[in-house]
UniProtKB/Swiss-Prot annotation:
Domain NAB, first and last residues per copy: 10-84
Protein name: COP1-interactive protein 1
Main location: membrane
UniProt KW keywords: Abscisic acid signaling pathway, Cell membrane, Coiled coil, Cytoplasm, Cytoskeleton, Leucine-rich repeat, Membrane, Repeat
The protein's role, per its UniProt record: Positive regulator of abscisic acid (ABA)-mediated signaling pathways involved in abiotic stress responses (e.g. osmotic stress) and leading to various plant adaptation (e.g. stomata closure).
Length: 1586
């Protein structure tokens, strides 16, 4: 029975491990995988996968590797399943036979005992089969993992494609950045040019200030030089005298010639030295003269610039004044003043033209004088040339006289040439002089014979010397005259400086006047703008007249006359409107006052213009005086030139006479020539200065012409403004007509209201309620829309800030993408290398292509699934993009709605104002109607009360009469007729009562109707309140939506921040985990040392162990539990194979070795082994705890990786949102461009209209075109200034943007460096992990070797123990009877032990398989590590290169930015100063204008209120008149009715009187009858008595 139980347990343990159906399924899957692998290889080799050969080779190599691993696993699986099936079938047959004979006899037990070991081995084999099945399942899981790896590879490829797209985008962004850089460079060049221009201007100004002082100093130097020249002239005269004395000495004694020759040599040397000194001095003087001329030219340029600036300022002042005149003339209807102003301007223009013509004539005279001066210069040069020829002739004569001294002639000719080049031929002259002296000494004897000849020649020479001296005197006089002219010119320069200073003071005063005028003009402009705003109300009425005026403008040629006529017509129409509209009398009176003030302003402005014209005329006169002075100076210079020419002739005559002193005279001639050149240079400089002044005058004339053109254009502008004023007048006329029409309509409505008072009450009440509700709704809508607009603006601001932040994040992402691109490039290089390596392995794997078809199919299916996933992802992306587009469209629609809302707000505001006016009118009407109704009610109530009193009195009378009638009927029937008449009268009175009751019922109905109207009004108010509440609810919902959008934006920002913090936390946690792993590894090493110590203790204790079998059974049960826990741990270890499987395998091997030793030493184990096993259990528990910790760490790492991936996905989503926002921005930019185009078209239309007007007015304003052109040029200059200021502001903005970009780039660089550091740290951590894994592998190998050594030792011990067991078998037979009872227990224990051994073997096999897999993975990891190292090196190189380039770019940008910042700072300081001045003036003017505008607005409001009140009062008066009329009618009706009632009463009274008289007569008759009867009765009684 126990054996059956044991077999059943084995079957229950092993049956699930081998299933026939699962085996067939695995075969089918194997065939499918083989087909798929073959298909993939075929596609790869045919080139269907990709066009790149590298990708094909990689895919083929991966498939082959996968297929080889798969085949190896499948072979192991086939072997294990085959062995298990054989063993299971054998056991099934043996189980049936053994079950019948299990309990038959005791002998079978012995067989079982003998065959126990064989059965245990079979059981062990079964257990190994089960373990093999588990290994196969693990292999299947490995295959699944590999499939996941393929999917990850495909995902990586998809990521690579996305990275390529990102690279393309990065390239585009780089191109854009390069374009921006080029633009920035261009802007910087322009900035540098502008800065250089400004610096040059500053330098010129400084030079202008310095040159004034330099000129003064140079004037003093010139005076000193003049004194020196005078002294030299005296010295020259003295030398002439000495030369004459020497000539007389020559006549007397020829013996003294030798001494004289020596003296002459000395004098020649001294003269040569003097000549050299003079030449150097002359050169220095020439250089100084040149510098002076340059400085004078610079001063003249500066003066010209100052004059131009003065003219510009004057023109600007004139422009401003004319602008203010235009503004005043636009809104003034003073045509006569305009005509006078035009006449004055035309006369002034004519005068200016005359001045210009005279100045042009003067310029022509100047040009002629300059031409004459140039001709005279040419004559002087010719005379100088003739003088040089005469000198040469004199030299020739000297050579003829000095026939014996031919060498002297050569020396003279050489010296003549040396005058032009003194420095170059000085040495040659010295040599010639020495040779000449020797020759003179040799020829003194021959000269004695020729003394007589020479005496005659000397006499002639003396005469010539006298003539030359006279000429020298004349030249000196002329030199003095030139010096005097120079002094005069210097004085003129001083005067010019003084005049310049005066002009500067005038300029400052003009600037102050200009500022004051600007203030006044700004105030006046604001007043005119207010008037224009007030006149805009009449624009609608004047449109028709404007169209007519435009048609007339096209036809008519003379614009000014037409304008004046139209203005007169407009004034007449205005006067007619004023006469027609009595309500607007006050506004027109105010306008008349304004017109009078404008007249005064216009007269003052005319006075200012006349003063300005007089100032310009004075300036022209001063310029003419300057021109006349310059002409005088030119004439003086010409006379000086003539005098110099005569002096030169005289000097040449003296040179012919002074033959002995020719050397000194030649030196002096050289000096004179140099002086002549200096004078010529001075004259040329004077001529240049004159030319410059003439040019300045021409420029001033040109400026005057430009001013004329500007004035003409300004006149055109004035005409245009007059046209606009006419348009406004026409519009006012049209508005007045509309007001009249509206007034007539209102009068008609009032008449209709009088006729239909009751219906109007109903309609007015309903209308008023509706208007009140509408007003409330509109006001609430305005408030809500304003709030929504503010919220939208705040949202726009927040969105703009978000966009900026997202752009920063985009830049960071782009930098990261660039890094990834570099990594991809490096990985591609490594892949190409690997492909070359793998190409060698292709031939080996060709045999496996057939078997890999099924694998190819599986891979195809996976590829298809991956493609489907990719499609799904693409669809998701497309959907997200569509959602982004939809969001962008919604945003654009929201912006359009906001614009529409703004427009609707404006419309509603205008409508609300109109409705308020109408509401006020209707309120007034309502109040008047209510008053009328109340008075009417009061009157009706009084009438009803009177009628009721009358009814009561009539009823009383009817009762009395009925009683009297009854008495009368009883008394007499004759009164029936009268009674019928009275009944008719009563019926009439009853009819009247019924009518009165009907009237009272009608009045009651009217009251009921009014009460119903009031009820309806209350209902409408309630409805309007409900609508207001609904609108408030919608506004609240919109605000909630806005708040939700803001909250989303804030959430996104918080999510981004939290994700960044999470990433940082994950990095910190990774570091902590790495530290913990390192600590755990250290603890594992310590545990390994403890285990080695324990193994040594086990060996010692094995020798001494002799424990009982019972303890072994308990220990085996514990080992079984441990094995179960170890199987669980192994499953966990299989999941965690990557990190710590090697350590577990080492420990499990040690445990296997220990268990084998225990199995072999079952009989000899004792209590010590139990203690050791308890220690092992503790250690295994510790190992399991460590493994669980490792798994937890891995799970945490995986979760963090997932979180990181999710963060990356969110970042991608944000980037896509940013793209959508960019698209929205592009759409907004397009809309803006469209709006700009519309504005341009409108501007073009306006320009076309202005062109038409200009064409119409060009025929009349031909004279003023010059002035207008000048004004246009000044306007263009002002526009250029404004444009430059705008460009400066733009450049400032660009500068700020560039600084922001630089900060962004720096942030991106910092982030890149941080990312690089994190990558380096991760790489270091990976390297440390690899090192640790290598160390653990080394430890595992060492432990494995030690385990093999221990196994060998244990095997020896086992053999020794077997021998001892053989010895003790005999003793065992004797004890067999005692052990029969315990045999079954031992068998069960042995079976358990065998099961444990089987499990251990299976676990060992699993561990070996896992070790193989790990070795393969280690190789793959090593390859990947090498790849990563190479990629890291390339990345480091690329990063260094990028860092260097970025740093260089940053330095360049920083330098350029600093330069631009300096320039901008200087410019900004100047601009701020100027802006401060202008802002002060503008602020003061704005304050004045503000007060004026407020006053005018208040006045206008008061006028409007007064007009409205007057209108309301008129309407009320009219209504009251109508009511009075109605009341009079009603009173007449009542009077008529009362008269009728009075007549009826009179008739009734008359009838009653008649009736009473009748009754009285009847009573009297009856009384008489009674008295008669009584008398008759008394008589009868008396008679009877008698």
């Amino acid at each position: 029975m126990k054996k059956h139980k044991f077999r059943e347990t084995l079957k229950s343990f092993f049956e699930p491990h081998f299933d026939h159906e699962k085996g067939e399924m695995l075969k089918g899957t194997k065939t499918e995988i083989d087909e798929k692998v073959n298909k993939i290889l075929g596609m790869v080799e045919s080139g269907d996968v990709n066009e790149d050969e590298s990708n094909r080779q990689v895919v083929a190599d991966l498939v082959k590797e996968f297929y080889s691993e798969y085949q190896s696993l499948y072979r192991q699986y086939d072997d294990l399943t085959g062995e298990i099936r054989k063993k299971v079938n054998g056991k099934g047959e043996s189980s049936s036979s053994s079950s019948s004979d299990s309990d038959s006899d005791h002998s079978s037990k012995r067989k079982v005992k003998r065959n126990g070991n064989g059965k245990v081995e079979k059981d062990v084999e079964l257990v190994t089969g089960a373990l093999k099945q588990q290994i196969e399942a693990a292999n299947l899981e490995i295959a699944d993992l590999k499939g996941k790896l393929t999917t990850t590879v495909e995902e990586k490829e998809a990521v690579d494609s996305e990275l390529e797209l990102a690279l393309m985008k990065l390239k585009e962004s780089e191109e854009i950045s390069s374009k921006l850089k080029l633009e920035t460079e261009k802007l910087e060049d322009e900035k540098s040019i502008a800065l250089s221009d400004n610096r040059e201007l500053h330098q010129k100004l400084e030079v202008a200030g310095k040159t004034e002082t330099d000129l003064n100093q140079k004037l003093e130097d010139i005076k000193k030089e003049r004194d020196e020249l005078q002294t030299e002239r005296d010295n020259g005269i003295k030398r002439f005298q000495e030369a004459e004395k020497v000539a007389e000495d020559w006549k007397t004694t020829s013996d003294q010639l030798k001494d004289e020759t020596s003296n002459l040599k000395q004098q020649l040397e001294a003269s040569e030295q003097r000549v050299s000194e003079l030449t150097s001095g002359m050169n220095s003087a020439e250089e100084e003269n040149k510098s002076l001329s340059l400085k004078v030219s610079e001063i003249s340029d500066v003066i010209q610039q100052g004059q131009t600036t003065i003219q510009e300022l004057i023109s600007e002042l004139g422009e401003m004044k004319e602008k203010y005149k235009e503004k005043e003339s636009e809104h003034s209807s003073l045509v006569e003043l305009h005509k006078t102003h035009e006449r004055e301007s035309s006369s002034q223009v004519k005068e200016l033209e005359a001045h210009i013509e005279s100045s042009e004539k003067l310029v022509a005279d100047f040009t002629q004088s300059l031409n004459n001066a140039e001709e005279e210069k040419k004559l002087l040069s010719q005379k100088i040339a003739e003088l040089s020829n005469e000198i040469q002739e004199a030299q020739n004569t000297m050579q003829e006289l000095m026939s014996e001294s031919g060498q002297l002639k050569e020396s003279h000719s050489v010296k003549e040439r040396e005058l032009f080049s003194l420095r170059d031929i000085h040495e040659i002259h010295q040599r010639d002089s020495s040779t000449r002296a020797s020759e003179l000494e040799a020829q003194l004897e021959s000269s004695k014979q020729q003394v007589s000849d020479l005496s005659a020649s000397l006499k002639a020479a003396e005469e010539e010397n006298k003539a030359i001296s006279s000429k020298n005197v004349e030249t000196m006089n002329k030199l003095e005259q030139t010096q005097n002219t120079i002094q005069e010119l210097m004085a003129e320069l001083g005067k010019l400086k003084d005049s310049h200073r005066e002009k500067e003071s005038e300029l400052s005063s003009l600037v102050e006047v200009h500022e004051t005028h600007q203030r006044d003009s700004s105030i006046h402009v604001k007043e005119l703008e207010e008037q224009v705003e007030s006149s805009k109300k009449l624009v609608a009425e004047l449109n028709q007249t404007l169209n007519n005026a435009e048609e007339e403008k096209k036809v008519l040629s003379q614009k000014i006359a037409e304008l004046s006529n139209e203005i007169k017509e407009a004034q007449n129409t205005i006067q007619e409107l004023v006469s027609e509209s009595g309500q607007l009398k006050e506004s027109h009176s105010v306008k008349d006052r304004d017109l009078f003030s404008l007249r005064d302003i216009h007269e003052t402005h005319q006075r200012e213009s006349s003063t300005r014209v007089s100032e310009l005329e004075a300036q022209l006169e001063s310029s003419e005086q300057r021109i006349s002075d310059l002409t005088v100076d030119l004439k003086d210079a010409e006379e000086e030139n003539k005098a110099i020419s005569s002096k030169n002739l005289e000097i040449m005559d003296k040179l012919e006479q002074a033959q002995n002193t020719i050397k000194e005279l030649m030196d002096e001639l050289g000096e004179l020539k140099d002086r002549h050149k200096e004078k010529e240079s001075e004259l040329s400089s004077l001529v240049k200065s004159a030319d410059q002044q003439v040019a300045d005058m021409k420029q001033s004339l040109d400026n005057a012409e430009e001013e004329k053109k500007m004035l003409s254009q300004r006149i055109l502008d004035i005409s245009n403004e007059i046209q606009e004023a006419q348009k406004t007048i026409q519009e006012h006329m049209s508005e007045s007509e509309q007001l009249k029409e509206s007034h007539g309509v209102k009068e008609r409505e009032l008449t209709g209201l009088r006729d239909i008072h009751e219906t109007h009450q109903r309609e007015s009440s309903t209308r008023l309620s509706e208007l009140e509700t509408q007003l409330k709704l509109l006001e609430q809508r305005v408030v809500d829309l304003s709030a929504s607009l503010n919220a939208a603006e705040e949202e726009k601001k927040s969105l703009s800030s978000m966009i900026l932040e997202i752009t920063d994040e985009l830049k960071q992402a782009q930098s990261k993408v660039q890094e990834l691109v570099t990594e991809l490039a490096e990985s591609k290089d490594t892949l190409t290398q690997k492909e070359n390596e793998l190409s060698s392995f292709v031939e080996v794997h060709e045999a496996h292509k057939r078997d890999s078809s099924s694998q190819v199919k599986e891979l195809e299916a996976r590829v298809e699934s991956a493609e489907e996933q990719v499609k799904e992802l693409n669809q998701n992306l497309n959907s997200s993009e569509e959602e982004k587009k939809i969001l962008s469209q919604q945003i654009s629609e929201m912006s359009i709605k906001i614009k529409r809302a703004e427009s609707t707000i404006q419309e509603l505001s205008s409508e609300s104002e109109r409705l308020k006016g109408s509401h006020a009118e209707k309120d007034n009407e309502l109040f008047s109607l209510r008053d009328i109704h109340e008075t009417h009610q009061r009157e009706l109530s009084t009438q009803l009360r009177g009628l009721e009193a009358q009814l009561e009195s009539s009823e009383h009378r009817v009762l009395e009469l009925s009683e009297s009638l009854k008495a009368a009927e009883e008394e007499s029937r004759t009164m029936s007729t009268k009674i019928s008449e009275t009944s008719d009268e009563l019926e009439r009175t009853q009819i009247m009562v019924q009518e009165l009751t009907a009237d009272s019922s009608k009045l009651k109905e009217q009251l009921a109707e009014k009460e119903s109207k009031l009820f309806l009004l209350t209902e409408k108010d309630s409805k309007s309140q409900v609508q207001i509440k609904e609108l408030e609810a919608t506004v609240a919902t919109l605000e909630l939506e806005l708040e939700s959008v803001r909250a989303r934006i804030i959430d996104l920002e918080t999510e981004i921040a939290s994700k960044t913090t999470v990433v940082e936390q994950l990095e910190a946690q990774n570091r902590e985990m790495v530290a913990r792993i390192s600590e755990l590894e250290k603890t594992m090493e310590e545990r390994g040392t403890e285990l080695s110590a324990l193994t040594q203790k086990l060996e010692d204790n094995d020798k001494q162990s002799s424990s009982s079998i019972e303890t072994l059974t308990a220990e085996i049960d514990g080992l079984r539990a441990e094995l179960d826990s170890m199987s669980v741990q192994k499953e966990e270890v299989e999941k965690q194979m990557v990190c710590k499987s090697e350590e577990a395998s080492v420990k499990i091997k040690r445990l296997d070795d220990e268990v084998n030793g225990l199995r072999q030493q079952v009989a000899s184990l004792d209590s010590q082994r139990a203690e050791l096993e308890i220690q092992l259990e503790k250690k295994s528990e510790e190992i399991s705890e460590y493994l669980s910790q490792i798994t937890n760490l891995k799970e945490e790492i995986i979760n963090k990786v997932k979180v990181h991936e999710s963060i990356l996905e969110e970042i991608n989503g944000l980037s896509e949102k940013i793209k959508g926002r960019e698209l929205e921005l592009e759409t907004l930019g397009k809309q803006r461009s469209e709006l700009d185009e519309e504005l341009r078209t409108k501007k073009e239309e306006n320009v076309q209209m202005h062109d038409k007007i200009n064409v119409a007015s060009s025929e009349i304003m031909a004279l003023t075109e010059l002035i207008n052109n000048l004004k246009n040029e000044l306007d263009s200059l002002q526009v250029q200034k404004s444009e430059t200021e705008a460009e400066l502001e733009r450049e400032k903005q660009e500068k700020s943007e560039l600084s922001n970009q630089i900060t962004d780039v720096q942030k991106a660089l910092v982030e890149q460096e941080a990312a690089y550091n994190t990558l380096e740290e991760e790489h270091k951590q990976i390297n440390e992990l690899f090192k640790e894994t290598e160390a653990t592998l080394n430890k595992v190998t060492v432990d494995y070797k030690e385990a093999q050594r221990l196994l060998e030792e244990r095997g020896k011990e086992v053999t020794s123990r077997d021998s001892t067991i053989g010895v003790h078998e005999e003793t065992m037979e004797s004890l067999r009877n005692e052990l029969e009872m315990k045999g079954d227990e031992i068998e069960t224990l042995m079976e358990k032990i065998s099961n444990i051994e089987v499990k251990l073997r299976l676990s060992n096999q699993k561990l070996r398989v896992t070790e193989q897999v790990l070795t393969e993975k280690e190789e793959a990891f090593r390859k990947e590590e090498a790849k990563h190292l190479e990629e890291q090196a390339l990345l480091e190189k690329n990063l260094t290169m990028t860092h260097e380039t970025y740093r260089g770019m940053i330095k360049e940008i920083a330098d350029k930015v600093n330069i631009t910042v300096d320039g901008f700072q200087s410019m900004s300081e100047k601009l701020t100063e100027k802006q401060g001045r202008y802002e002060k003036t503008v602020m003061e003017a704005s304050k004045i204008l503000w007060t004026a505008t407020n006053w005018v607005i208040e006045r206008n409001h008061e006028k409007e209120k007064m007009n409205k009140e007057i209108e309301k009062k008129d309407e009320e008066i009219k209504k009251l008149g109508g009511k009075v009329r109605e009341d009079e009618k009603e009173k007449e009706m009542m009077k008529e009715t009362l008269m009728g009632l009075g007549e009826e009463k009179r008739e009734a009274i008359r009838q009653l009187c008649v009736w009473i008289d009748h009754h009285r007569s009847r009573c009297e008759y009856l009384e008489e009858v009674l008295s008669k009867t009584v008398v008759a009765r008394g008589q009868r009684r008396v008679s009877q008595r008698t």
